[in-house]
């Protein structure tokens, strides 16, 4: 998920003791959660990551979402990327930024999945495949199911139902643990300057 100079430069976002991190924690958590869901929640085993602050240190740095200068005491990253290896052999590359020189106004959130039988893009719902016998390339757009509620609101309803009915959480804790372990791995890898193991 990438943004171009689009963030809220207040303490709750830019001070690590209050936020826990920058865009990795703020917006990366959402794209990572969705990606792992699309992948079937494989177990992460190692992470190589970078989490740095460069662009928001420049003189005159600003956010299109908030007036004024970026606070001088900002101590979280403005860009992070990670390479994740999973127990099943899958890999993942993630990039998140609040301030990247990227051709978007607002937010660019995309997921590309690549497998042996095809590739897919979210949110475009494109599916790409190849017939190796006939040497044909196929590009299809999948039908997107419409929702009665906005997806985030639907998540809240499902969680409330689970609590009211003493049922299991619709999102098992293990899935959230994988997300947090990967984000933590990106920060640990940045600090240690190497690939780190994810112990779960």
Regions found by a protein language model. Give the residues of each.
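Predominantly a Rossmann-like dinucleotide-binding segment in NAD(P)-dependent oxidoreductases
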Residues: 1-73, 193
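Active-site rim elements
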Residues: 20-23, 69-71, 143-147, 165-173
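Residue-level signal for the nucleotide or nucleotide-sugar donor/cofactor binding architecture
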Residues: 26, 151-154, 171
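A general structural signal for well-ordered alpha-helical segments in protein cores
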Residues: 31-32, 153-157, 183
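Solvent-exposed beta-strand sheet faces enriched in polar/charged residues
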Residues: 48-50, 95, 199
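NAD(P)-dinucleotide binding in Rossmann-like oxidoreductases
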Residues: 58, 70-79, 83-154
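C-terminal helix-rich "cap/oligomerization" subdomain common to oxidoreductases
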Residues: 87, 159-200
């Amino acid at each position: 998920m990438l943004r171009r100079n689009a963030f809220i430069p207040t303490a709750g976002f830019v001070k690590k003791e209050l936020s826990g991190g920058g865009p990795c924690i703020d917006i990366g958590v959402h794209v990572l959660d969705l990606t792992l869901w699309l992948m079937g929640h494989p177990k992460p085993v190692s992470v190589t990551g970078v989490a740095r602050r460069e662009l928001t240190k420049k003189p005159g740095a600003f956010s299109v979402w908030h007036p004024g200068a970026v606070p001088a005491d900002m101590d979280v990253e403005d860009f992070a990327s990670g390479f994740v290896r999973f127990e099943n052999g899958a890999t993942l590359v993630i990039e998140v930024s609040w301030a990247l020189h990227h051709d978007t106004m607002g937010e660019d959130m995309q997921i590309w999945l690549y497998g042996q039988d095809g590739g897919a893009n979210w949110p475009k719902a494109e599916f790409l495949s190849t017939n190796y016998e006939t040497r044909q390339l196929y590009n299809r757009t999948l039908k997107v199911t419409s929702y009665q509620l906005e997806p985030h609101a639907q998540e809240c309803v499902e969680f409330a139902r689970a609590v009211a009915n003493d049922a299991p959480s619709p999102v098992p804790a293990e899935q959230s643990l994988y997300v947090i372990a990967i984000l933590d791995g990106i920060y640990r890898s940045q600090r240690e300057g190497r690939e780190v193991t994810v112990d779960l």
